[in-house]
């Protein structure tokens, strides 16, 4: 091991790196039991396996000069080094399974799509160049075709779970209705036990608003059974609804719903919009109270008439009557 001067090696990400030879330790190659140490075995194994590119975390940059001394001692070609900066949980902490950060398997179990995870992770610490620089969505085949080492960043990347959720939602929207249903069906069946409910219709309703599959139970649990809810939900600033006009709206909507012969989203919407026009109120004055009455939730996977069409006439009317009773107390 040289003790004077410097040693320089090239890394594809960090460029030329120079270290003081006096900082290199005289490494042990064989342990007392005759077995090789990791650094020694690693170099020999990589050479015998024909490894041309060594890709690893930037924390191992300091080990490269020690490896190079072994390559040179054996007369072997030094591989191309590609040291990648770590993926961070935040500005100060690296991602770590010990601290509860998710693995790939965890993300898939939560309902993320493989395609979305691959796309997002590929762009952590790497960015495409040229005509591809402005794009965010890539297939695995496209990534393999356009990948170039020069796009790897020296700066650590932060894993943003909210960005991944957004990207996953975009991939969900792109699925065909059949493909989405095949993924959502097991989750929907675990929550919705009423055989009268058309699960394909539920899937079609939630797909445009689904970020990850594990969100679905909370989104659709009201379908099987109306949850206990506070009448505060009827008060909505944007819709300009109050407890008083919500009661009036439900009371006015009830006979319209009872008299409706065609129970579809379109027929329901037309009838209720006509009612709003007759009462000379905004559509939301009728539709928001109805939405709350049939779902018991502030956020739903669809609008009032979509939910009514899904629940069916009998169940929808029963829930409207329950809403009227709550508002009359």
List the model feature ranges, each with a label.
Residues 1-83, 88-95, 103, 261:
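Active-site cores that bind ATP or allylic diphosphates and position pyrophosphate for catalysis
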Residues 49-54, 102, 253, 271-273, ...:
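Glycine- and acidic
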Residues 52, 65, 115, 162, ...:
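Short alpha-helical basic/polar micro-motif
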Residues 74-231, 240, 295-329:
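Catalytic adenosine-cofactor/nucleotide-binding cores of aminoacyl-tRNA synthetases and other
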Residues 234-235:
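Basic, amphipathic alpha-helix used for nucleic-acid engagement in HTH/winged-helix/SANT-Myb modules
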Residues 243-291:
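C-terminal accessory/binding modules appended to enzymatic or scaffolding proteins
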């Amino acid at each position: 091991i040289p003790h004077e001067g410097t040693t320089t090696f090239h890394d594809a990400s960090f460029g030329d790196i120079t270290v003081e030879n006096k900082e290199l330790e005289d490494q042990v190659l064989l342990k007392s039991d005759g077995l090789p140490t990791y650094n020694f075995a690693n170099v020999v194994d990589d050479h015998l396996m024909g490894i041309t590119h060594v890709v690893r975390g930037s924390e191992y940059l300091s080990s490269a000069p020690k490896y190079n001394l072994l390559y040179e001692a054996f007369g072997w070609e030094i591989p191309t080094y590609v040291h990648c900066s770590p993926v961070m949980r935040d500005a100060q902490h690296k991602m770590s399974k010990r601290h509860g950060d998710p693995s790939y398997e965890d993300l898939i179990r939560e309902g993320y799509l493989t395609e979305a995870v691959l796309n997002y992770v590929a762009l952590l610490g790497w960015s495409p160049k040229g005509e591809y620089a402005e794009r965010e969505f890539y297939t695995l085949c496209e990534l393999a075709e356009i990948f170039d080492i020069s796009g790897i960043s020296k700066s650590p990347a932060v894993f943003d779970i909210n960005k991944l959720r957004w990207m996953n939602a975009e991939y969900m929207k792109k699925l065909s209705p059949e493909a989405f249903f095949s993924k959502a069906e097991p989750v929907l069946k675990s929550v919705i036990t009423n055989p009268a409910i058309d699960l394909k219709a539920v899937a079609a309703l939630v797909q445009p608003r689904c970020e990850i599959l594990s969100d679905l139970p909370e989104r659709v649990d009201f379908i099987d059974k109306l949850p206990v809810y506070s009448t505060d939900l009827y008060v909505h600033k944007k819709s300009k609804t109050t407890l008083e006009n919500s009661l009036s709206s439900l009371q006015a909507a009830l006979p319209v719903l009872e008299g409706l012969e065609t129970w579809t989203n379109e027929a329901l919407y037309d009838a209720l919009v006509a009612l709003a026009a007759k009462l000379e109120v905004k559509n939301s004055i009728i539709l928001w109270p109805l939405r709350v009455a049939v779902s018991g939730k502030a956020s739903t996977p669809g609008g009032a008439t979509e939910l009514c069409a899904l629940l069916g006439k009998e169940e929808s009317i029963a829930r409207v009557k329950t809403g009227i009773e709550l508002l009359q107390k």
